[in-house]
Structure formats: C-alpha cells, structure tokens
C-alpha cells in the first residue's frame, strides 16, 4: 500500500513562524502605512524613513510579538481546520466540498483570531512604537513583557481590545488561505498536468494569498486602528465611521504592502507546511 502523511496539529504554527521571520519587515511597513492619519508616504518611502531614523534592525521591531502571535493565532486555526478536515474525510471517498472548507475556515479563523488577540495587540504596538514621540513610547522589551504590562497597567480586558475585529479578520484570512489553498490545490491536481510537488504548492498558495489579501484588507485597516488607539474609538462601528471620513481609499491604506507581505507569507507558510508534513508528518496507509 502507498504511504501518505498528514500534518501534526502544531505544524501550522511552526510553518507560520518560519514565514513570519521572512516577511516581518513587510508586516511592520504595513502597520506604519495603515496608522498614518493622512496618506503621506508610500511603501518605499516608509521603508527608507524607518531605516534612516532607527536603523536597519528597526524593520524587525516586534518580531517576538509576531512569533508569539503565530504560535497562538495561526497554531489554533491550522490545528482546528486540519484536524476537523482530516476527521471529516477519514471515511469518505473524496475531498470536502468547497462550502464545507469555507465553513471550517470561518470557524477556525474566528477561534484563532480570538485566541491570538493579546499577542496581536502587542505586535501592532511594538511595530508602531518608533513612530510615537519619546515621551509616549511604550518600550516593551519583548512580547511577554508587553502582555504583562498591558494586563497590569490597562487591565486584562484591554488585552482583548479589538477581539471582534481580529476574529472577523481571522475568519476571512483563514477562508482565503486554508480553504482556498485546499481548493486550488485540488483543482490544480485534477488537471493531471501537475503532481503533488513544490510547484503545485507554490501555485496553490499564491492563489490563496491573493484571495486572502482582497478579502480582509478593509477589516485589517480597522483592526490596526482599533488596536493602536488610546481610547478615541468607541467600537468597531465608530472606528469605521471615522475612517470613512478620510475617504474610501482609507479602507485600503497599505493594500500593496499588505499584498506584498501576505502573498509571500502565505506561499512560505504552505511550502514550509508541506515540507514538514512530507518529512515529519503522521504516516497513514492508503
């Protein structure tokens, strides 16, 4: 009998951490662009300003929080999605229909988004800290220090500021990434022209990254503004209204860097994940 392998529940978190290490500078630039009150700088200009002002390593500000986020948010959503998908297809003759993948992706993303909200809050703050005046900087030493100080100084409730938005975005991103990746890979393999190899993984994940970017950009902007606020927004709706006053384009601030960051991040995540599954996955006789 042929031997196949399935993912272990924590592979998604490990793969996402590997991808985050590669794409963190792009994530940082995306946050800087989204938190501008007016559109003053584009992606290249923002990158040059960060390097000139704080040095090249400033592009990696908040990396510990980003990794902490991946080990909460991404680990949770991948674990739920892949475990449930494998369970639901265990005795079936074919893959899940697309609507089932979308439903699974939505549930997994909602849960992962909520679990990852505290780390996401600290991640956004650490990335944006250098833009603040010296007197207003939070100067978190690392992710755990940030989590501890937010809980101590602002209360445990503040750790989940923007949880609704983060969960909603998590659902959209997970549908765009995991559900669309599975579907794209299934369609590519069904043509018979490509086998289950690295190029297939690259093509499928590239499609998934594009889907995820377009699905979640407006919510991503609102989430970033909510998490970086000092209480000026009363909620998601109020934040949306205030953002709308800046014009429709305000909802798509940082669209290019979001795509430039999310598409490579998605590609790297799934290529790492497929290699982890291939070499270290659970053996299944088929």
UniProtKB/Swiss-Prot annotation:
The UniProt transmembrane annotation reads 9-29, 62-81, 102-122, 162-181, 202-222, 254-274
Q: What is its main location?
A: mitochondrion
Q: Name one GO biological process term.
A: malate transmembrane transport
Q: How does it sit in the membrane?
A: Multi-pass membrane protein
Organism classification: Eukaryota, Metazoa, Chordata, Craniata, Vertebrata
Query: Is Cytoplasm among the key words of this record?
Result: no
> Solcar repeat positions in this chain?
7-87, 100-187, 196-279
Alphabetized Gene3D superfamilies for the sequence? Mitochondrial carrier domain
The family line of this record is: Belongs to the mitochondrial carrier (TC 2.A.29) family.
Q: Which InterPro entries match?
A: Mit_carrier (IPR002067), Mito_Metabolite_Transporter (IPR050391), Mitochondrial_sb/sol_carrier (IPR018108), Mt_carrier_dom_sf (IPR023395)
Any one GO cellular component localisation term in the record: mitochondrial inner membrane
> Where in the cell?
Mitochondrion inner membrane
> What's the domain of life for this entry?
Eukaryota
Q: Which Pfam families match?
A: Mito_carr
For this protein, what reaction is catalysed?
A: (S)-malate(in) + phosphate(out) = (S)-malate(out) + phosphate(in); malonate(out) + (S)-malate(in) = malonate(in) + (S)-malate(out); (S)-malate(in) + succinate(out) = (S)-malate(out) + succinate(in); (S)-malate(in) + sulfate(out) = (S)-malate(out) + sulfate(in)
The UniProt GO MF terms for this protein read: antiporter activity; dicarboxylic acid transmembrane transporter activity; malate transmembrane transporter activity; oxaloacetate transmembrane transporter activity; phosphate transmembrane transporter activity; secondary active transmembrane transporter activity; succinate transmembrane transporter activity; sulfate transmembrane transporter activity
Q: Which PANTHER family match?
A: MITOCHONDRIAL DICARBOXYLATE CARRIER-RELATED
Question: What role is this protein assigned?
Answer: Catalyzes the electroneutral exchange or flux of physiologically important metabolites such as dicarboxylates (malonate, malate, succinate), inorganic sulfur-containing anions, and phosphate, across mitochondrial inner membrane. Plays an important role in gluconeogenesis, fatty acid metabolism, urea synthesis, and sulfur metabolism, particularly in liver, by supplying the substrates for the different metabolic processes. Regulates fatty acid release from adipocytes, and contributes to systemic insulin sensitivity.
Ranges in a coiled coil: none
Give expression by tissue: Expressed most strongly in liver, then kidney, and at lower levels in heart and brain.
Task: Report the protein name in the record.
Answer: Mitochondrial dicarboxylate carrier
């Amino acid at each position: 009998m042929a031997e196949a392998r399935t993912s272990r529940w924590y592979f998604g978190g490990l793969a996402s951490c590997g991808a985050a290490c590669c794409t963190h500078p792009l994530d940082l630039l995306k946050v800087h662009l989204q938190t501008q009150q007016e559109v003053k700088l584009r992606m290249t200009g923002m990158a040059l300003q960060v390097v000139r002002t704080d040095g090249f390593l400033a592009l990696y500000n908040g990396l510990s929080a980003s990794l902490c986020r991946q080990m909460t948010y991404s680990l949770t959503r991948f674990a739920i999605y892949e475990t449930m998908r494998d369970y639901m297809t265990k005795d079936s003759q074919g893959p899940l229909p697309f609507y089932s993948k979308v439903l699974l992706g939505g549930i997994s993303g909602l849960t992962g988004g909520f679990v990852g909200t505290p780390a996401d809050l600290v991640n956004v703050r650490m990335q944006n800290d250098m833009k603040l005046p010296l007197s207003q900087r939070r100067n978190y030493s690392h992710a755990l220090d940030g989590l501890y100080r937010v809980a101590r100084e602002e209360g445990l409730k503040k750790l989940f500021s923007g949880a609704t938005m983060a969960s909603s975005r998590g659902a959209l991103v997970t549908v765009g990434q995991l559900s669309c990746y599975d579907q794209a890979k299934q369609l590519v393999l069904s043509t018979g022209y490509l086998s289950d190899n690295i190029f297939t993984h690259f093509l499928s994940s590239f499609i998934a990254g594009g889907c995820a970017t377009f699905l979640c950009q407006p919510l991503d902007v609102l989430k970033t503004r909510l998490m970086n606020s000092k209480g000026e927004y009363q909620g998601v709706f109020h934040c949306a209204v205030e953002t709308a006053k800046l014009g429709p384009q305000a909802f798509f601030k940082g669209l290019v860097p979001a795509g430039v960051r999310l598409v490579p991040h998605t590609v790297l995540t799934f290529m790492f994940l497929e290699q982890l599954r291939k070499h270290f996955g659970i053996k299944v006789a088929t």
